[in-house]
Amino acid sequence: MTNHTQIAYNMNMLFIETSIFTKRITESVCDEDYHKLQVHLAEHPDAGDLIRGSGGIRKIRCAASGRGKRGGARTLYYWDAPDKIYMIFCYLKNERENITPEQLKTLKKLVEENLK
């Protein structure tokens, strides 16, 4: 994974973002709400629901500007090490309910080839 941003936060947790995640999250969520999500994940990295058949990718809700958590953004991330969380993809609920099987296959391959 060559295109990513590294951000260190509390509890020595390192957040590593894919370039598409960085683009999507900045379009969807204000900095304050994203920071709250990072703090929450640093303290509870297993908070997101495991996506079946994903190779360990988790999905968690994140409040989006003016939408709250329910109607907000969905954040996909991978956590396998005690000090790193890979922020993989983000989308708004009004764009789609879930990722497609094709997208899931691609993200699973990304995890298997680059993050494990």
Identify the function of each model-found stretch.
Residues V39-K69:
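A short, surface-exposed loop/turn module that caps and links secondary-structure elements
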Residues A64-G66, Y77-D80:
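Short, low-complexity Ser/Thr-rich regulatory SLiMs
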Residues L14, R58, E97:
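Residues that recognize and position ribonucleotide moieties
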Residues D31-Y34, L104:
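Amphipathic alpha-helical transducer elements in NTP-driven molecular machines
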Residues R70-T75:
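Short, surface-exposed coil-to-beta transition loops
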Residues M1-E32:
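Arg/Lys-rich, positively charged N-terminal/basic patches that mediate binding to nucleic acids
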Residues I25, L37-Q38:
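Short Gly/aromatic-enriched secondary-structure transition segments
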